[in-house]
């Protein structure tokens, strides 16, 4: 039996109420002082990392005990992550900082199923968490010889400017030209198996105005970007995306473009710079410019719609207008959402009763959730435009430079690379040779634990749906096996549907996503409207013309739902928008009859559909 050593730090956990204080997040007029207690279970004899993969903290909020569970965000940085700034004489300085043992976490509150957390544990706890439906911020109070932290609500941070802040996107621009993969990287065979997650390899660019705003403190700027990216990563996790930082560029001496308050000018200039310079220097899928200037009017962000993977337009520009990093993350997530084909939410969209990320303006309490509309629009864009650059998970093999032992990048010929002998914190790896130490089977990976392969059968990737079984360690490798799905067309949900790319699409779920609770699939007679071939009732478009459904295909056109919600009696409810004609259509792979599924507007035999 494995003995467990319980490590307890700072036993004090009593709260204290304060009326006003100045913190990094701004002037806070109501806060609570807490003393988080860290409790971590370590196997006896285990070597503790500087920042553990999993941690647990206990403290009190409003007098009630809270247990915060944290897990390191292992998808925050790519293995070839780089940072670039410039010397006073204009020389470019690029480094590959150690990122494996970073201090950024996602988490949850014990016994609160709707809770979330995005926390930096670099110097105390700093970040945000959702508890009982409310968003709280936490950060150290920077008192000498004290573990005191302040916990407060976003609404209690004084705002310098109460005017509503808006996204500048008003036009429904879409790129209908074929979007080709920018990178020449070929997927390894294991990656050709369908992966439920998409990976957006992102470069963040910080302009000279930001450097001036933060008095040239590059560490403060970097920390702000890390925390914002960690928040953003959590937001996209529920969309089945991983937003991975592959690079941070800080224009320390001068801007590489002219950054103006005119968002149209600045967005186009940044897009041109990205296309002509950045793509040649750094493999990536998307770039975001963070600026310290004030955009014209109330605009704080701007981006192209439906442009992910486009060599020029896969960009967004964001104004850093709030000291709260969660706010910056929301704007970054919002603008990237436009790149992924997502429009602004309207009155029909919802996200569990909370404000939604894709609202046209920043809500009084920044949201961490995408709406049902956003989910449908995003995946509709992916299915219809196939932006291939987001299909590959960032790997060490993406690196083009010659292998170099000690750079913390796992390259050809190396079994491990933990940095220089002075900085190496991996007990499994010989830093001088980049080979595993004697007796070690592995040095990293989801199936590696204390330098040994994890036991065969240990779960390493959870099931995401009935059509997506969990993966388990083999006992022979440090890596989790490739993610595999049940075969397309296999029955699921008690034969109500058929598996399709790891999901089980059925009309009831699609109705719920569009309209909310008390919504069901409509009677068959409602779908007869799809025979009309008019502006809303059709099966598919060919050369811009809407093709009416044949009798056997009517359940593969517009989706019809029965609304039994209070005060409603609509047996044939449907959704149509001129701005997004695809929204409200039955999704591919949906069951349309016994033994049949929708494919390109036809109801076809499931045995031949795939």
UniProtKB/Swiss-Prot annotation:
Its EC number is 3.4.24.-. Keywords: Calcium, Disulfide bond, Glycoprotein, Hemorrhagic toxin, Hemostasis impairing toxin, Hydrolase, Metal-binding, Metalloprotease, Platelet aggregation inhibiting toxin, Protease, Pyrrolidone carboxylic acid, Secreted, Signal, Toxin, Zinc, Zymogen. Residues 198-394 form the Peptidase M12B domain. One of its GO terms (biological process) is proteolysis. Residues 1-20 form the signal peptide. A motif (D/ECD-tripeptide) lies at residues 466-468. The modification Pyrrolidone carboxylic acid is found at residue 192. SMART domains: ACR (SM00608), DISIN (SM00050). The keyword Lyase does not apply. Negative results: does not degrade gamma chain of fibrinogen. Does not inhibit collagen-induced platelet aggregation by activating alpha-2/beta-1 integrin (ITGA2/ITGB1), or by inhibiting alpha-IIb/beta-3 (ITGA2B/ITGB3) interaction with fibrinogen. Does not cleave platelet membrane glycoproteins, including glycoprotein VI (GP6), GPIbalpha (GP1BA) and beta-3 integrin (ITGB3). Monomer. Belongs to the venom metalloproteinase (M12B) family. P-III subfamily. P-IIIa sub-subfamily. This is Zinc metalloproteinase-disintegrin-like acurhagin. It comes from Deinagkistrodon acutus (Hundred-pace snake). The lineage of its organism: Eukaryota, Metazoa, Chordata, Craniata, Vertebrata.
């Amino acid at each position: 039996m494995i003995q467990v050593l319980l490590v307890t730090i700072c036993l004090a956990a009593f709260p204290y109420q304060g009326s006003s204080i100045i913190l990094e997040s701004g002037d806070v007029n109501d806060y609570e002082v807490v003393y988080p207690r860290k409790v971590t279970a370590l196997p006896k004899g285990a070597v503790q990392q500087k920042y553990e993969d999993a941690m647990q903290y206990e403290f009190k909020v409003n007098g009630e005990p809270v247990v915060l569970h944290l897990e390191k965000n292992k998808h925050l940085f790519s293995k070839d992550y780089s940072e670039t700034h410039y010397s006073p004489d204009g020389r470019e300085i690029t480094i590959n900082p150690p990122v494996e043992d970073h201090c950024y976490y996602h988490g949850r509150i014990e016994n609160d199923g709707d809770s979330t957390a995005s926390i930096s544990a670099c110097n105390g706890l700093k970040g945000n968490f959702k508890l009982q439906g409310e968003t709280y911020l936490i950060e150290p109070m920077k008192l000498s010889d004290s573990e005191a932290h302040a916990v407060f609500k976003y609404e209690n941070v004084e705002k310098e400017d109460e005017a509503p802040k808006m996204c500048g996107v008003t036009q429904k621009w879409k790129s209908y030209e074929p979007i080709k993969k920018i990178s020449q990287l070929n997927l390894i065979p294991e990656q050709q198996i369908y992966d439920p997650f998409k990976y957006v390899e992102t470069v963040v660019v910080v302009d000279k105005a930001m450097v001036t705003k933060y008095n040239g403190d590059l560490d403060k700027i970097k920390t702000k970007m890390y925390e914002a990216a960690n928040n953003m990563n959590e937001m996209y996790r529920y969309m089945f995306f991983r937003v991975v930082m592959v690079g941070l560029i800080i224009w320390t001496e001068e801007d590489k473009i002219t950054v103006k308050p005119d968002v149209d000018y600045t967005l186009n200039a940044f897009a041109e710079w990205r296309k002509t310079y950045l793509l040649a220097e750094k493999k990536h899928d998307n770039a975001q410019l963070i600026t310290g200037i004030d955009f014209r009017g109330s605009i704080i962000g701007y981006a192209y719609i439906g442009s992910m993977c486009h060599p020029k337009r896969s960009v967004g520009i964001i104004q850093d207008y709030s000291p709260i990093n969660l706010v910056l993350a929301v704007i970054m997530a919002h603008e990237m959402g436009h790149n992924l084909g997502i429009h602004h939410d309207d009155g029909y969209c919802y996200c569990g009763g909370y404000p939604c990320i894709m609202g046209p303006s920043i809500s009084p309490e920044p949201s961490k959730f995408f709406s049902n509309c956003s989910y449908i629009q995003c995946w509709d864009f992916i299915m219809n435009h196939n932006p291939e650059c987001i299909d590959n998970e960032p790997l060490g093999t993406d690196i083009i430079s010659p292998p170099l032992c000690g750079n913390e990048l796992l390259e050809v010929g190396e079994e491990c690379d933990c940095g220089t002998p002075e900085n190496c914190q991996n007990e499994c790896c010989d830093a001088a040779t980049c080979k595993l130490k004697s007796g070690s089977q592995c040095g990293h990976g989801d199936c590696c634990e204390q330098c040994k392969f994890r036991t065969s059968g240990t779960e390493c990737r959870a099931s995401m749906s009935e059509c997506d079984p969990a993966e388990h360690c083999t006992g022979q490798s440090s890596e989790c096996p490739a993610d595999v799905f049940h075969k397309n067309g296999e029955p699921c949900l008690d034969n109500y549907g058929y598996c399709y790319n790891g999901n089980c699409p059925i009309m009831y779920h699609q109705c719920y996503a569009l309209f909310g609770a008390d919504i069901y699939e409509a009677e068959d007679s409602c779908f007869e409207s799809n025979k009309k071939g008019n502006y809303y009732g059709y099966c598919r478009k060919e050369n811009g013309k809407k093709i009416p459904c044949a009798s056997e295909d009517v359940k593969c056109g517009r989706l019809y739902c029965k609304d039994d919600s209070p005060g409603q009696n609509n047996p044939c409810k449907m959704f149509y928008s001129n701005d997004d004609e695809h929204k409200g259509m039955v999704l591919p792979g949906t069951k349309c009859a016994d033994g049949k599924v929708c494919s390109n507007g036809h109801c076809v035999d499931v045995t031949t559909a795939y």
